[in-house]
């Protein structure tokens, strides 16, 4: 990129979709993860890349991995399930968007709300976009996330009784909100320090909702339940 920039004078816009795929799928391969993080740091960190990179946009499920307590790429501005900022309406479908879809596809809005609503981001109700689109095209109310690889991967976590985790999950399934400390999570999907780390991971994956004001996690909707 540096050589092309030197020859053409043009800067690049870099887009990486699912930047965290190696963090999730190669969780046990620490060497590969470190090589990948070092690659990203070499590409984006410091003043040198700004000579030839105009903008970098990374999307993924997890926040940028931390090294000890510091972000591996601290020159990025992050928008997450815990802190979506002013991008909250773009994390999924809003109430108004779902109402419009229900009208166009002749669906009962309250039933759609019961199944796929429940995420609370920056005070806004947000719906699971994949599930809503699948409902509109397939015309069946059901759990669409059980068909994904991520769902299979988290089953061992849900079945753990790590630090009382199973009891907390059961409480949430019955409708309870449970307190969670989301700030200790290091984005490490192998070495969970406590049940709060697991719950925070599930919040990032979208399997739990999070009320930032109350600092509590909950089951967001019927699809997850």
Tell me the role of every PLM-derived stretch:
Residues 1-225:
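Phosphate-binding site recognition
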């Amino acid at each position: 990129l540096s050589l092309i920039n030197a020859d053409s004078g043009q800067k690049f816009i870099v887009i990486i979709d699912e930047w965290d795929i190696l963090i999730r799928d190669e969780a046990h391969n620490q060497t590969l993860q470190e090589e990948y993080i070092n690659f990203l740091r070499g590409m984006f960190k410091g003043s040198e890349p700004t000579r030839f990179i105009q903008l970098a946009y990374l999307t993924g499920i997890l926040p940028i991995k931390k090294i000890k307590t510091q972000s591996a790429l601290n020159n990025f501005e992050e928008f997450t399930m815990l802190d979506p900022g002013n991008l909250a309406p773009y994390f999924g479908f809003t109430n108004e968007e779902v109402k419009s879809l229900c009208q166009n596809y002749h669906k009962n809005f309250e039933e759609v709300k019961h199944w796929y609503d429940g995420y609370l981001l920056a005070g806004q109700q947000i719906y699971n976009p994949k599930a809503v689109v699948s409902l509109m095209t397939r015309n069946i109310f059901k759990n669409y996330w059980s068909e994904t690889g991520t769902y299979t991967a988290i089953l061992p976590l849900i079945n753990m009784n790590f630090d009382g985790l199973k009891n907390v999950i059961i409480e949430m399934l019955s409708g309870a909100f449970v307190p969670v400390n989301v700030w200790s999570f290091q984005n490490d999907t192998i070495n969970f320090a406590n049940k709060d780390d697991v719950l925070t991971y599930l919040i990032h994956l979208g399997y739990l909702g999070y009320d930032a004001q109350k600092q509590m996690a909950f089951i967001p909707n019927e699809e997850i339940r």
